């Protein structure tokens, strides 16, 4: 496990090893948070919280297990917690929440990502982004989400089909 080497270095006092842990997991953490929260700023907040929790709890990580899955699980739990809190606080005023009423700010990640965020459920979006943007294998994603590989594959294929159908409807 590549991350284990850096975790061990960090535990032994090499603070620069955390940079490598961050660089190797940041895209995954971001896209998992984004898939749950559907908000870039909140996803970035979850990233900060996630890495603070990783720093705080790195001593409890068991070397030899899947470090990526451990970090992704923390991010997923933090995003779910934030979503629950936001749902309780969410205003239904049209002017305060334009995104709820169909008006979105332009997304720097592209129209296709916007379309995927709108069409896909949380798992489908997470899996799609982890495969396409982060380069994870379905087996790795299955471990991250405690999901059988055939289920990951099905959700990935389903996400692609939904996107293809939507693009065909729009004339692409």
Regions found by a protein language model. Name each.
Residues 7-29, 125:
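A short, charge-rich alpha-helical start-of-domain segment used by transcription regulators
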Residues 11-12, 38, 49-66, 85-86:
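Sigma70-family region 2
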Residues 12, 87, 99-130, 134-143:
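Amphipathic alpha-helical segment used for protein-protein interaction
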Residues 22-40, 57, 117, 166-169:
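Amphipathic, Lys/Arg- and hydrophobic-enriched alpha-helical face
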Residues 26, 30, 51, 125, ...:
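C-terminal flanking helix
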Residues 31, 45-52, 56, 65-77:
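Structural recognition of an alpha-helix C-terminal capping motif at a helix-to-coil junction
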Residues 56-63, 72-92:
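Arg/Lys-rich amphipathic alpha helix in sigma70-family domain 2
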Residues 80, 133, 138-139, 143-172:
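DNA-recognition helix of helix-turn-helix
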